[in-house]
Amino acid sequence: MGYGGGGSGGGGSGGGSGGGSAGGVIGGVGGTGAAVGRTKKFLGSRGIMSGGATPNRNTIDFWNIPVLSSALDFGDLSIGRQHMSSCSSGIRLITFGGNNPPDASRIDFNTFLTLGDATDFGEMTGERSSGTNRVGSAPDGNRGVFMGGTSPTTGLSNIDYITIGTTGNAIEFSKMTANRDGQAGCSDGVRGLTAGGNPPQNHVELVNISNLSDAVDWGEIPVAQIFSGDAGTSDGSRGVFVGGYGGGTDNRDNVQYVTIGTLGQSADYGELFNGNYGATNSSDGTRMCTAGGSEPTGYATTIQYHQISQGGTALDFGEITQARGMAGHDSGG
């Protein structure tokens, strides 16, 4: 099905139930904040936005997150597509899946500090698109995780992983608690969270990235959303989810946060310029940049930003090279 007001909505449907036991996934998670003593390798000063809709784009943009500016051309994806999901080791950007159509199983990679076209990395365990299935890519600097998605219209509970520094095919990691698509993800380097989903929901699941065990319930975000594109990011402790779709023509302007290391701690703490479904998000650990997306007047070229520690109303950062949404997006370098 299609959804999303403004520009054209993304496709995909899911829901239903899946499997998954706790299996010790929480590990060291408690009420004491983020992972301690770890370098947040997956954060960096260069934001990269890949592909998007509509039509299917192969464009890759980049910008310097600490400096207000417009994006520049970085290169091209292997094929134009939308509804992908990205993750980062800080050195290498990975782009999973997407919809051309049909759904794709391909995985591309770029090196953050080397301008150029994407290179083939390998294949996912099956053809899946993200965006309408924004699956949580949750990197610890070495392992990238892809959760849920649709193929082609059925929500999945699969969790795939890759070793970011080594090209090759993805391996099935474990299962989510239910079949889900339309989520957004974030990580503190140890724990990965995936929030929201289709139909609009506020459920949040947790996976320990280093353990091959099933996801467990984390809690809820305040506002039920379908997310699309890489709408989640973090500063290594606080995870942030932007915009989303609530049904009908209801594109949301909410900015919501979670404290990744504290089960159930979340709040609605800011706003985007407009209701926006399909915006993408990245962070350098201090500043969060939100790019593109579908707004009431159509697809946007805007890059907006927040200081993650403060929230509030978004401020103007610059422009991307093409109006689009439902893209891949992360930071490194």
Q: Which residues make up each language-model segment?
A:
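Polar, enzyme-active/binding microenvironments
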Residues: 1-333
